[in-house]
């Protein structure tokens, strides 16, 4: 089972919150104290809470569930995309479009258009167009890929959201809440943990901390998927009993 230790978190700077003047009182139970005007997060809480979240994600993946990684802050985007791709899951790394979950019907149409344009770009259709028309379609393709590329093969709503930065991604969290989709989120000392089913109190800005979260979630999803494949193989008669 994928787990993260206290040492891992200390080395990544997970315990460094925001300046005390920007704190959200709802995070008080998870704050150890303050140092040089910066809140220190109590990792005695974070370690078990994150490991519980990882176990949940692994369980979702073991049942063929879809994990949607969400992190549109500049510091998070790259790690979110890399980690989601590494475990064959899905991501939003650029901008959360309002209605991405709650208006899935419309989003599905946009994904259909994205796939049409992708086909046209490789089957020679673009070459037959005027220069202006080809440029317009190329721009449309790039725009759609940027906003929907990470969910184009999701094939329906996700089974869990993994979010870096609860305050920054509050719209995504609210949409998930409206649809009853569980939310795992990293919540810093300046944020409210409202609407988050699995709270991970921790720094949501430092690259090392973000990479620790995303790589751990990817590993948990992979482990869960591995269990699913092992069960499937056994059912298909590929695994011989000793």
From Swiss-Prot:
It comes from Shewanella baltica (strain OS155 / ATCC BAA-1091). InterPro entries: Ribosomal_uS2, Ribosomal_uS2_bac/mit/plastid, Ribosomal_uS2_CS, Ribosomal_uS2_flav_dom_sf. The gene is rpsB. GO terms for molecular function: structural constituent of ribosome. NCBIfam families: rpsB_bact (TIGR01011). PANTHER family: 30S RIBOSOMAL PROTEIN S2 PROKARYOTIC AND ORGANELLAR, SMALL RIBOSOMAL SUBUNIT PROTEIN US2M. GO terms for cellular component: cytosolic small ribosomal subunit. Coiled coil: none annotated. One of its GO terms (biological process) is translation. Keywords: Ribonucleoprotein, Ribosomal protein. The keyword Ribosomal protein applies. This is Small ribosomal subunit protein uS2. The keyword Ribonucleoprotein applies. Belongs to the universal ribosomal protein uS2 family.
